[in-house]
């Protein structure tokens, strides 16, 4: 497995799958078929390669929901979610004429009794093993996981949602499987909208925060490499399309298999561009060496070249990809984003680069509105203006909506109220919404266009240092002694109304963001871990946010 995936959550999940799903089937020496649903396909893809499966005796991987040729002489491993659709598909494989010699069934988490009884009734004699392995989340990065539930946002925040409680219960169960996988063993005893009760002996502290805690971070133009890429470039399923010198197009996968990506992803774009001349020089030097070698190659030289060629070629490809991506990002930055960033930072921080308080946020916003920026960028700036004031007047709000020309799409702004974020500065909302107190970071060196620090970083640091305020963070259960007397913490702040080289053997902070997590917040988990060697921070959410994706989610809340 790759450098970035050899550690952290991905390695732990792959080890758990080997120790349960594969170990149970290893007693038989014959080769087996692995059958997956959509979720488990993504799960396995995130933590292993086909070569890893082959080495464990699995020769074929197939889709549970597609037509498959029977292979009656082979045994099949079914790895799937405990849903009616998956169970029905499994039963159909054995109901009439069995497709396989036997079935080893593994569910990602708890299988309801009615589904279990249905399987037992229809094909019990074909089932050799039936287990729940408690891995119902995706390990996206060494310290990042998701519940792979983009629909959760709508279910939780839509007014009068019919499936809010069911969605929250599902998320709670998924968090429990994470804790089980990490061997932190908290037991879920109670889950309400914004509290999470855990108990049991554990080395972890668990915090759950609501998206409304920090509406600013996912809206700002973030200028670190990974966050900037997913904001400005159309990257789908982590695939980045770039052009070669001959005009042809190629795709590159931006994940932890790419060591250069792991190295660069949390750097500021100014630092990344500082690396580009070196990368270009190395690529050019490689081409020159290749030309020289083509002219005077010996058998011994050819042998040496062949030995290092795969790794060498991979390194050169990675460098080419990141030269292209960095240039793409700088092109966007210089064309549009640079003009926005100063205004955005002043509105978010509440002060300018010299530390002078912004007395009239409208004067900061106005140049953005008058410039021919993209409508989405103007919406983002308007939101930052409103957030800075903790809501604005109805008259002012209507003027802003008209100025941005979104009278028929005002939900991009108005629907933030469904998250509990003040948009109109009514007395009741002002009393019910209290902003999280911020740490003073004025002594830290920052770029003028990157002065904002996500609220979550403050919370992570306070949790690690045992400084969370009891009045804001009601404790739910006893925390491990490793936290020096602190206790495991429940969740949302209660207002009224780069990958590490190894896993820490000490404490672990798990922070879950209900309603999506931004790339800038993901970066904070790595930074706090790096700064506190005795504690590893893992961050997770229902799904990963991009600014445009979040705005679309907000807009659809009243549809």
Predicted regions and their residues:
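Extended, well-folded catalytic/binding cores that form a central cleft or groove in large enzyme
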Residues: 1-559
């Amino acid at each position: 497995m790759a450098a970035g995936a050899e550690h952290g959550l991905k390695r732990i999940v792959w080890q758990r799958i080997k120790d349960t799903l594969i170990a149970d089937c290893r007693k038989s020496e014959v080769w087996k078929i692995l059958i997956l649903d959509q979720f488990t396909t993504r799960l396995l893809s995130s933590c292993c390669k086909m070569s890893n499966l082959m080495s464990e005796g699995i020769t074929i991987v197939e889709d549970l929901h597609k037509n498959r040729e029977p292979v009656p002489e082979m045994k099949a491993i079914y790895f799937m979610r405990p849903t009616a659709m998956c169970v029905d598909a499994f039963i159909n494989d054995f109901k009439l004429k069995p497709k396989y010699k036997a079935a080893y069934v593994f569910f990602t988490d708890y299988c309801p009794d009615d589904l279990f009884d249905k399987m037992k009734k229809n094909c019990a004699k074909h089932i050799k093993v039936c287990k729940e392995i408690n891995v119902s989340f995706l390990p996206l990065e060494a310290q990042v996981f998701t519940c792979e539930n983009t629909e959760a946002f709508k279910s939780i925040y839509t007014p009068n949602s019919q499936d809010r409680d069911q969605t929250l219960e599902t998320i709670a169960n998924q968090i429990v499987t994470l804790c089980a996988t990490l061997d932190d063993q908290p037991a879920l005893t109670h889950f309400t909208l914004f509290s999470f009760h855990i108990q049991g002996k554990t080395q972890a502290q668990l915090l759950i925060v609501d998206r409304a805690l920090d509406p600013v971070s996912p809206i700002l133009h973030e200028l670190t490499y990974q966050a900037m890429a997913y904001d400005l470039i159309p990257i789908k399923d982590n695939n980045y399309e770039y052009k070669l010198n001959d005009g042809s197009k190629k795709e590159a996968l931006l994940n932890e298999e790419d060591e250069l990506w792991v190295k660069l992803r949390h750097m500021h774009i100014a630092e990344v561009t500082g690396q580009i001349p070196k990368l270009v020089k190395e690529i050019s030097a490689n081409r020159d060496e290749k030309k020289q070698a083509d002219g005077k190659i010996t058998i011994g030289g050819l042998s040496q070249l062949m030995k290092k060629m795969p790794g060498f070629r991979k390194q050169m490809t990675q460098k080419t990809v990141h030269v292209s991506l960095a240039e793409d990002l700088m092109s966007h930055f210089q064309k549009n984003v640079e003009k926005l960033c100063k205004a955005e930072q002043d509105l978010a921080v509440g002060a300018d680069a010299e530390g002078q308080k912004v007395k009239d946020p409208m004067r900061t916003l106005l140049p953005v509105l008058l410039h021919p920026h993209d409508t989405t960028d103007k919406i983002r700036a308007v939101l930052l203006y409103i957030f800075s004031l903790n809501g604005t007047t109805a008259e002012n709000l209507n003027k802003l909506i008209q100025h941005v020309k979104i009278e028929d799409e005002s939900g991009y702004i108005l629907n933030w109220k469904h998250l509990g974020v003040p948009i109109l500065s009514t007395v009741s909302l002002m009393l019910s919404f209290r902003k999280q107190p911020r740490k003073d970071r004025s002594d830290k060196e920052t770029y003028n266009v990157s002065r904002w620090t996500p609220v979550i970083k403050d919370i992570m640091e306070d949790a690690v240092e045992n400084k969370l305020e009891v009045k804001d963070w009601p404790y739910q259960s006893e925390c491990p002694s490793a936290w020096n007397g602190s206790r495991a913490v429940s969740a949302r702040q209660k207002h009224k109304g780069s990958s590490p080289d190894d896993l820490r053997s000490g404490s672990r902070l798990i922070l879950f963001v209900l309603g999506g997590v931004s790339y800038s917040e993901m970066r904070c988990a790595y930074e706090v871990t790096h700064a506190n060697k005795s504690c590893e921070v893992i961050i997770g959410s229902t799904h990963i946010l991009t600014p445009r994706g979040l705005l679309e989610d907000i807009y659809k809340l009243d549809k």
